[in-house]
Amino acid sequence: MFVRSSWLLLWGTIVWASAEPVTLHIGGTFPMESGSGGWAGGEACLPAVEMALKDVNSRLDILPGYVLNMTNHNSQCQPGLAMQQLYDFLYKPPTKLMLLTGCSPVTTVIAEAAPVWKLVVLSYGGSSPALSNRNRFPTLFRTHPSANMQNPTRIHIMEKFKWKRFTILMSVEEVFVTTAKDLEAIARKKGIKVDRQSFYGDPTDAMKTLQRQDARIIVGLFYVTEARKVLCQAYHHGLYGRRYVWFFIGWYADTWYIPPPEEHLNCTAEQMTEAAEYHFTTESVMLSRDNIPAISEMTGMQFQQRLTQYFQKDTANVGGFPEAPLAYDAVWALALAFNCTRNNLPSHIRLENFTYDNKVIADTLFQCVKNTSFRGVSGKVMFSDSGDRIARTQIEQMQGGKYKIMGYYDTTSGDLEWYNKEQWLNGKGPPPDSTVIKKHAMTVSNEFYYPTILFAVLGIAACVFIYLFTQKHHERLIIFQSQPECNNILLIGCSLCLFSLFLIGLPSDDISISESLFPLLCHARVTILLFGFTFAYGSMFAKVWIVHRMGATENQQLASRQKDEEENTPWEGIRTLISTMVGRQALMRKSSGQAYGALLEKRNTVLNQPISSSKFYVIVAALTAVDVFVCFVWVLIDPLHLTEQKFPLFTPADSEEDEMIMPVLQQCQSNQQEVWIGIIMGFKCLLLVFGTFLSYETRNLKLRFINDSRFVGLAIYNVAVMTLVTAPVVTLLIHGKVDANFAFISLTVLICTYISVGLIYGPKIRHIIKVPPSADEIQLNGNVGPGVMSKVDQKRYDMLKKENETLQIQIEEKERKIHECKERLEELTKNSETEDMNAQLLCENDKQIADENLTYSTATTLTTTIPLIDLQNGNHPGQIYENDNDDDGSSTSSDEILL
């Protein structure tokens, strides 16, 4: 049975061969010159198609009894001309079963109209991605892969060389516009930034734009005529060389960059060659390079050698030579589809019966083309559902004026086969995708940071030393009467302020802070400096506030006491004492007790009373609570975060020209930064001004248990002036100058802390070192005695003491005279009564003289002298007062006065 069937098939073939073959007509358009379309592909593709027709017609196993014949026209890649040629194909006999088209513009207009006449269109040169639209082109198939198939290859190359930005330069033809849109969409999905520039005819303006945009990686989408114009302008604008990488379409001729004389480009061949060096091309594989024969029984290389014989010039200058294998395989695909259709048609329908309204033959032919699969000279030929050719992409680079294959990309698998043979003009690897902009964090220079940190460490160490020193000598009167607990808060605050300089100076030249830790650094800066200021200044403010309040209380008590003294003044008793000294000792003792009681009351005022430490703690705690509340609300609703303030770029002196430095200032910022700064600074400024006012008001007040109030006031003056001057300067004038900003802040903190600690603790340390503990006025039982007098009080005391000594001498002289008078009175009593009367009169006169001399010790003098003598001798007033209640009759009048 098998032998019989074979003989029947052979007999049928012989019969068909012996009979006159039936001619099947096809129409073809070929762009024989570039024209305005820019691709003269017909120059090589037409000979390739003719070669394929000859080979197909010579095969007895394909379309037996039929021969293929083609009617062709030169479309010049002009859509309008192509429409006229389509009209000729349709309305001039014979009937065409299928159409072959070349460039994309021509394919677009023919394939869009062909379904009306039930024609299948097979394109050997249409690469426009728009042609993949099945709704618009339902009967189109292409042996030329879509231009979109090269886009994944381009993206893989970008990723391989770590380029995150490139620019598309395209002509405005639809094929390139759609390719650019697809490439941009893929790039954005990969996180690659894409810029686009288009031109029509003259690319000069577009090249200037590329230069302004600092484009470095440029993908060109245009026909070869525009490609030469672009390359010439790239040379004139300097957009070539080691800093630039160009991607061109791979189906140009190998010497496409050499300008033909008729184009009159303003570039020589040498200039164009220089500009074209090291560019890349991507193109679908159009020629099989293996040794496996195709359906035509030729390998790809054999086909290329055979086609070369058709030309009398270098094939590099032949338009469409790379696409010729696609045109050759298109004829074979067409022939196989006809053969398939012949075998699948009903017996009563034959191929030669095709008309433009024959749907049966058209549908059968469409399905046969769609299912076509064979090995051609361009590789495996098959079509996708959209009619596109499925093929690998080849990447080449021009090196030394010749193209070298760099690798292949398989679209179906997504694998990039790379040979690592790429070369670069600079010899240092691929150039960057743009001018390398290196961010340079504007940090505090080491020349400022480390000396400041040194002084801060010394200040903290000094605070620790002073604390230990005062703890060791806490029993000394000068320490005990200065509120040491409040002063310890000052030391803590100063230490926190000094420690904050470590954080304010970060990041420095040698110390960097990660972005994740920067918000924590921001909050630490604010809180530590804020609490340090509150502790340090708040402790001093608490002192001047309490001094002011106690001074006000003392003034009220003094006013009340003066009112009482006006009604019953003790000086009347003193005058009575002086006037009745002789012979009236009980009365004199009573009057002296009344006078000293008034002096004792004047001495035990509010200013000399002990002060509880809790009063200072309450004030500092209240100020701290305000800061805690503000910071908590700030962090909760509007936290600080890292922001970068960018400054103008500059080119470093010792770097490559494609590298620039962008200074960046890292700042702590919140959404309502000005509001929070205003709240904090407003409160602190009011506190500073009020503290300065209180210091001025209490400048003359001396409290025994705040013995350093005068130095506290001076420290407040210093802090207020430095802070009120520095804050506006730092906030408004030098906010963006890192070193100046840090210098102002650090100097303010250092000066305020050093001067405050020095003013408050310097005199104490000096006193403790120079004055031994035995000289302190501290009683053995631990009760505190009188305070140390100031220089003014000491001078006043010396004057009153000298006056008192003078008065004491005068009193002694008068007492001596009184004693003499008494003796004379006794003698005269013995002689006679008359003499007694005379002596009595004489004594009365002397007594009168004594009364007049004793008035030199005025009430004011005695009022001041008695307490000052008591202060100088260290006597407790209670001891003297107890002696006043003693009825010892042996005391003389001088003893009573000199208490």
Curated annotation (Swiss-Prot):
Expressed in the nervous system, including cholinergic motor neurons, but not in GABAergic motor neurons or muscle. Pfam families: 7tm_3, ANF_receptor. The chain crosses the membrane at residues 448-468, 488-508, 526-546, 617-637, 675-695, 714-734, 742-762. It comes from the Eukaryota. It is found in: Cell membrane. Belongs to the G-protein coupled receptor 3 family. Component of a heterodimeric G-protein coupled receptor for GABA, formed by gbb-1 and gbb-2. Within the heterodimeric GABA receptor, only gbb-1 seems to bind agonists, while gbb-2 mediates coupling to G proteins. Ligand binding causes a conformation change that triggers signaling via guanine nucleotide-binding proteins (G proteins) and modulates the activity of down-stream effectors, such as adenylate cyclase. Alpha-helical parts of the C-terminal intracellular region may mediate heterodimeric interaction with gbb-2. This is Gamma-aminobutyric acid type B receptor subunit 1. It comes from Caenorhabditis elegans.
